[in-house]
Amino acid sequence: MGVIKAVAVINGNNNVKGSLQFIQDSTGVTHVKGRITGLTPGLHGFHIHALGDTTNGCNSTGPHFNPLKKDHGAPFDTERHAGDLGNVVAGADGVAEVSVRDTQIPLSGQHSILGRAVVVHADQDDLGRTGHELSKTTGNAGARVRCGIIGLQASV
């Protein structure tokens, strides 16, 4: 398997915007890199959601991508949704530099994330570690601030 590339553009009617590149290497590891601006400083939940449907904004992107029907967790946990990518950190300037490597978000095969949404949340993802009622499903990460659809990128 060769290198596969995809992109997601994050934009909308608020100040949050950005661009993310997804690169799956020949070993099956996908690297997500890019920049998101306009965020409030601090940690923000960062997930792949099941659907690429934005007819109702980011609210129609469905739950976290979870083909193996597991509980929510941290990116390094065995028990986690495939789409659980943890948090991105926005500095005092509201900019988050994203760099995530993961084996559970392939760009090809049965559990491909192509056509699904990447979502940035308003609050910190608790990584399934608190007693909050939403901890094991959403990480209690709050509202969906902005999202983008992951689409195949031309290999030039």
Swiss-Prot record:
SUPFAM superfamilies: Cu,Zn superoxide dismutase-like (SSF49329). It comes from Mesembryanthemum crystallinum. Zn(2+) binds at residues 64, 72, 81, 84. Its main location: cytoplasm. GO terms for cellular component: cytoplasm. Signal peptide: none annotated. Its cofactor is Cu cation; Zn(2+). Disulfide bonds join 58-147. The lineage of its organism: Eukaryota, Viridiplantae, Streptophyta, Embryophyta, Tracheophyta. InterPro entries: SOD-like_Cu/Zn_dom_sf, SOD_Cu/Zn_/chaperone, SOD_Cu/Zn_BS, SOD_Cu_Zn_dom. It catalyses: 2 superoxide + 2 H(+) = H2O2 + O2. Binds 1 copper ion per subunit. Binds 1 zinc ion per subunit. This is Superoxide dismutase [Cu-Zn] 2. It is found in: Cytoplasm. GO terms for molecular function: copper ion binding; superoxide dismutase activity. Destroys radicals which are normally produced within the cells and which are toxic to biological systems. Homodimer.
